[in-house]
Amino acid sequence: MFSRNFYYRVKYQINKKAIFDVFYQYFANRLKHPFNKNQKKKLKRLHQKYLETKRTSTDYFSINAYYWDLIINKNFKEFSYLEIGSWEGNSASYILKNFKTKKVFCVDVWDTNNDSPKEEERSRFKNFIFNLKEFKERFSFFKGTSDEFFKNNDQKFDVIYVDGWHEANQVYKDIDNSWNCLNVNGIIICDDYFYGDIKNNLVNNLPANAINKFLFENKNKLKVICVNNTQIFFKKITN
């Protein structure tokens, strides 16, 4: 009934000390897959087609378009959005193109130093600006670390996407800081929950370690609402 990768992911969750709700939502998501897989493919293809007009070196987002569409539309008619780790603006472009937003704020370090040894690193910010230029009046960005952004931030948000530096301590800081500026009933989306060597899961300095730690510490203040093969979504139900 389930693939080998499903069992590897369950083992991964056990190893990373996931709370029960994470197991439950992942299992529920896999049970629904036969019934929604066509819609997943449709939304994935639609966004990939849209990206043909953009400049992207990678696309890790399109596979999750279905979940963003489903969960955001179910919870919000209009919302404010923050993302930590914008890369070339793939996820931000999806938000701006498909939803009614109050504000969209993007945070990334974007290595724009002309002395950078890697041309691709210097081009990411240029790609980000190019990819979002059609929405230039609807978004803002902060060029710097997430720690620097949160230190001076006084804004609140309804949806926050955490996809910054993947070392566990930094992921935890990003989630904790995001939580503090998240409105009640707001949603945090964490990328790369299943990350690294899923089969052997020997490393304990990954996003899942930080995510599970935060979920355990705040389990009475939040609700896990979705776990797919790459991302986890949870809602703030109280301060």
Which positions does each model-derived feature cover?
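Intrinsic structural disorder/low-complexity segments
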Residues: 7-11, 16, 36, 77, ...
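Boundary detector for helix-to-coil junctions that initiate low-complexity/charged tails
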Residues: 1-33
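Class I SAM-dependent methyltransferase Rossmann-like catalytic core
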Residues: 24-77
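S-adenosylmethionine/decaboxylated-SAM
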Residues: 50, 54-55, 65, 69-239
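N-terminal compositionally biased, intrinsically disordered segments and leader/signal-like regions
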Residues: 6, 57-59, 239
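Intrinsic-disorder/low-complexity, polar/charged segments
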Residues: 12-18, 59, 63, 167
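Arginine residue identity/basic-tract feature
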Residues: 4, 9, 30, 42-45, ...
